[in-house]
Amino acid sequence: MNLSCSLVLLGGGKGERFNSLQPKQYTHLCGEPLILHALHAYQRLPFVQEVVVVCEEQYRELFLPYSVKFASPGTLRQDSVFSGLQQVSTPWVCIHDGVRPFVYADEVIEVCSAARKTGAAALASPATYTIKSCAPVRTLDRDALAVIHTPQCLDTEVLREGLLLARAMDFSLSDDTEAAELLGIEPTLVFSNRVQIKVTYPEDLLFAETLLSKSSTYK
């Protein structure tokens, strides 16, 4: 199966909850900015044809040693994704958050393969916590729920049409594959049994450092 695709790497978030002077994706993890951990992992994948980094101009110098395109971030995450999509030249696109430093080749391959069958796919983990809705308060069946991560892979035109529809509806998307859902496409979920870290708080960075420094599994 031909898995050729583009990568849109999101690096435009402000990260207010991280309590840092710089956006969390540029905070160092074991001597290297978080976002570069993800970039290096994707650049080792031969089927990734191009990389589009969505970031503020002041951070572009960090990526100059690499063969990447640039796009400017928007107000919402979906605006940033749409901005990056304008630089994509392949029929398939993979989206990855710059604050998710751990990327596993087998999972990217599985997500991209699954997307070819339905038009959209996302990496997921089973819900392990008890989750309640707030209004009204009631317990949800966690066996019917999943926690969604990146990578997420979509048909480029499906994503474009879904993002445009969301904009026309003034609808805020929770993730990228929800753009496909708006078009009536049911995304495929690829379940992972690994720890999936999204660095949101300073404690997340400490956890990531521990994993990266002490376990060869995450290197």
Curated annotation (Swiss-Prot):
PROSITE patterns: ISPD. It comes from the Bacteria. Keywords: Isoprene biosynthesis, Nucleotidyltransferase, Transferase. One of its GO terms (biological process) is isopentenyl diphosphate biosynthetic process, methylerythritol 4-phosphate pathway. InterPro entries: IspD, IspD/TarI, IspD/TarI_cytidylyltransf_bact, ISPD_synthase_CS, Nucleotide-diphossugar_trans. The record marks 17, 24 as: Transition state stabilizer. Its EC number is 2.7.7.60. CDD domains: CDP-ME_synthetase (cd02516). The record marks 142, 198 as: Positions MEP for the nucleophilic attack. It is an enzyme of class 2 (transferase). Pathway: Isoprenoid biosynthesis; isopentenyl diphosphate biosynthesis via DXP pathway; isopentenyl diphosphate from 1-deoxy-D-xylulose 5-phosphate: step 2/6. GO terms for molecular function: 2-C-methyl-D-erythritol 4-phosphate cytidylyltransferase activity. Catalyzes the formation of 4-diphosphocytidyl-2-C-methyl-D-erythritol from CTP and 2-C-methyl-D-erythritol 4-phosphate (MEP). PANTHER family: 2-C-METHYL-D-ERYTHRITOL 4-PHOSPHATE CYTIDYLYLTRANSFERASE, CHLOROPLASTIC. This is 2-C-methyl-D-erythritol 4-phosphate cytidylyltransferase. It comes from Chlamydia trachomatis serovar D (strain ATCC VR-885 / DSM 19411 / UW-3/Cx). The lineage of its organism: Bacteria, Pseudomonadati, Chlamydiota, Chlamydiia, Chlamydiales.
